[in-house]
Amino acid sequence: LGVFSALLVSLIGTALALIAGYFGGTADKTICAVIDIAMAVPSLPLTMLLIAYLKSGMFSLILAISITAWTGTARILRTRVKQICELPYIKIEKAMGVSAPVIMVRHILPNLKDILLTRMALSVSGAMTTESGLSFLGLGTYGQKSWGNILHFAFFRNSILRKQIWWYLPPIICISVAVMGFMLVGYYGRQRRE
């Protein structure tokens, strides 16, 4: 679930960043305004609202998480696209009349690879945390096996009052290790890039 959400987040963020960074002007201002508005809305309540509105299922959960998580990727990639568009060879290609999609695919996207992989690793960890939280609250995919669902069922079977801590430890440890692993991969990619 986290990987599919990260792929969708990267797709949305990259598309909007390419449009805003390459074309600039009104498109850039509009997309930046949408990003600012989307970042101002708290993501967890919005995700909960989207899940309540959409049909229950794995695709709905992936879509709801992706709709609320693309803003950071779009903002970072937009800045990098604007920097790349100022390079001399991009200006020469524009002056020669090369079409925008060709320039984007041939020259800009390969230069975004490192940032995109780093953001994907961080997006996976964020999606895993969000899914676990939503499943714990009972808004995840019912019947699917997830660490959040294990926590949900343990909590609603009064495991705390019965002092059955072993119901909580395995999913908490697994969530922590998985999220920490993806975060470290993301931070390693960022350190390597700098």
Model-found features: residue ranges?
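Glycine-rich helix-loop "coupling/hinge" segments at transmembrane-helix boundaries
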Residues: 52-53, 81, 130-170, 174
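Alpha-helical membrane-protein architecture signal
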Residues: 27-34, 59, 63, 70, ...
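Generic alpha-helical transmembrane segments of integral inner-membrane proteins
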Residues: 3, 7-15, 19, 67, ...
